[in-house]
A protein has these predicted regions:
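C-terminal interaction-tip segments
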Residues: 1-31, 57-59, 92, 99-115
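Long, low-complexity N-terminal extensions
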Residues: 9, 51, 69-71, 108
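Asparagine-centered strand-capping/turn motif at beta-strand->loop junctions
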Residues: 23-27, 38-46
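Short beta-strand/loop motifs in extracellular/secreted proteins, especially
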Residues: 34, 46-51, 103-107
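Hydrophobic beta-strand positions in extracellular immunoglobulin-like domains
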Residues: 37-38, 111
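Short, surface-exposed beta-strand/strand-loop-strand elements in extracellular ectodomains
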Residues: 43-69
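Intrinsically disordered, low-complexity Pro/Gly/Ser/Thr-rich segments with frequent PxxP/GP/PP motifs
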Residues: 59-92
């Protein structure tokens, strides 16, 4: 199995009270999420907010049952989530979904994917 390493998503801006799929498996090619960078990218004065990261199986939806991380961010803070073992997405349609509450966040996901 050959892998490509690097960025799994572009920087994705997610506004308060919204969520977005930032990585989605295509053609049953496994995706290995090694890190998720989240930045509180709100207004120039900054606003504290919360980011939620979900691992959603194909056909599912983001919710308490698949929430993996709950990150409280102060104004203009950046956090890096690096699990000890990669999060593995295996089936077409499996996603990493990220939500923002109370402000705007920017998200970047890095890792490996099958080619």
């Amino acid at each position: 199995m050959a892998l490509t390493r690097g960025r799994l998503s572009n920087v994705t801006a997610i506004a308060g009270a919204a969520n977005a799929n930032v990585v989605t498996v295509a053609n049953n090619k496994k995706v290995y999420v090694k890190s998720i960078a989240i930045h509180d990218g709100g207004a120039a004065t900054g606003t504290a907010c919360t980011a939620y990261v979900y691992v959603v199986p194909n056909g599912g939806s983001a919710g308490n049952a698949n929430r993996m991380f709950n990150v409280a961010l102060t104004a203009k803070e950046t956090v890096l989530i690096e699990p000890a073992y990669p999060i593995i997405l295996e089936d077409t349609g499996d996603t990493i979904n990220v939500a923002a509450v109370g402000g705007t966040i920017n998200v970047l996901v890095n890792g490996d994917k099958e080619v």
